[in-house]
Amino acid sequence: MPSFAQAEDADLVRCLNAPTGSEQKQCTQALFQNAVEEMKKVHVRVMEKAAEADARNSGSGDGSAAAAIAASQRAWEIYRDAECRDVVGRGGGSGRMVWVFGCLAEKTRDRIRELNIPFDQR
């Protein structure tokens, strides 16, 4: 059975093999949008767990896990967007957005895996 990463790679390959540039762009954009929706769900779960941890650890002086994760997420989104739009997408061309959306989808999927790592293993 293929792994999660292999299935993702297969999705991207399917998009890149679409017959027209327009179809490739639509396909990679959909991959990105689906990854963002999944990341939002995972982020909500992580924030709920962080809030529970904050409640258990109140008064410990450790600071808020929820606030740290929220700040980390904002910084990560800035990094992802800059990396994909300004680095991968540099140079233009008709296929630029196919590569940008592919990059955005890939980095978002990577972030989902990171967010799914339990707190005590980070």
Residue ranges with predicted function:
Residues F4-R122:
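N-terminal alpha-helical modules
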